[in-house]
Amino acid sequence: MGQQTSLYQKHLDAGAKIVDFAGWDMPINYGSLIEEHNQVRTAAGVFDVSHMAVVDVGGKDAGKYLRYLLANDVAKLDEVGRALYSAMLNHDGHVLDDLIVYRMSFGYRLVVNCATRGKDLRWMIQNTDGYAVSIQERPRLAILAVHGPESINKVCEVVEEDQTNQIRGLKYFHGVELERFFIARTGYTGEKGVEFIFPDSDASELWDKLLAAGVKPIGIGARDTLRLEAGMNLYGHDMDETTSPLAANMEFTIAYEPEDREFIGKPALIAHKQLRDAGKLPELVGLVLESRGVLREGQKLVTDKGEGIITSGSFSPTLKHSIALARIPINSQSCEVDLRGTITTVRIVKPNFVRFGKKVFE
């Protein structure tokens, strides 16, 4: 038996099929994965993502420390509530993790992947020398993500009336501290929505209120197909500590300016850019298969520039055909995959397929 969130019994009561996910007993679905996927694309669904690790960083050097630790620049977080997506790199310029960092009244809050929790904490502590900072994991905090076109309206049905205007007024990648809740306009589905971070002792009450309001529970199976349609990476699949962010469609998570800011992995990234400019660094692209078949992680690819591999692949419930993320030689123009002995052409597109329920690639 693995670790369980405070909502484990609620998942069982809702008919969830439980699977192991990085040492956690998590609901993969409550019935039909496709129906859950479509629920988020057309209405509203709630995900229990309390398995993710919350780490609070405080102290007088917290900002200075995070400017060194992370590839993106927390100096951009110029007001409480703002959020930033960042890579955390090792000294080789490879991805130790991807995470979201929030500016809080007490300092900063990081939400990192559960599978990398131990590694991330060790790395963070290892790099505190010379900084007056405190690092505190918050295992008693729950995270519920509510996403879909109806999500904001549904959330406003279950919170205090005097909080609704603040929630409706939230900009993307902004959050607000409302009593015991921190509520942010962030997510992993390509739909609008919010994420609640709050004491796990209150999780059952909020879960019940959301379900009573008509929000449906969604498992990690649909969460994966939703994030894939949105072209969002999954750590350990689309990138890991052997992967440059430049080979994982993550350059937007790196702040090269101001030039005098040093951060872990920066010198190596300069070398990666030179490799890319010389055509020697692969890139992460989207693939579209409009004929029958399903693209799967690990399938090998052949392009006009060499070989590649699928890092994430699935049937797309929204598009009604298979899509994938793949790492292939840069500037490839054509691509083929072996599907059960049949060499099949797939189309190369930008790694972003669906946003707000609509196809976004050409």
Protein language model regions, located:
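Conserved, structured C-terminal
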Residues: 1-22, 27-28, 104-362
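Acidic, proline/glycine-enriched N-terminal capping motif
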Residues: 1-89, 94
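Membrane-targeting and insertion segments and their boundary/processing signals
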Residues: 36-40, 91, 98, 177-184
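Acidic active-site catalytic centers that drive phospho-/nucleotidyl reactions
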Residues: 48, 98, 195
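Generic hydrophobic, aliphatic-rich segments that mediate packing or membrane embedding
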Residues: 51, 61-66, 84, 95-97, ...
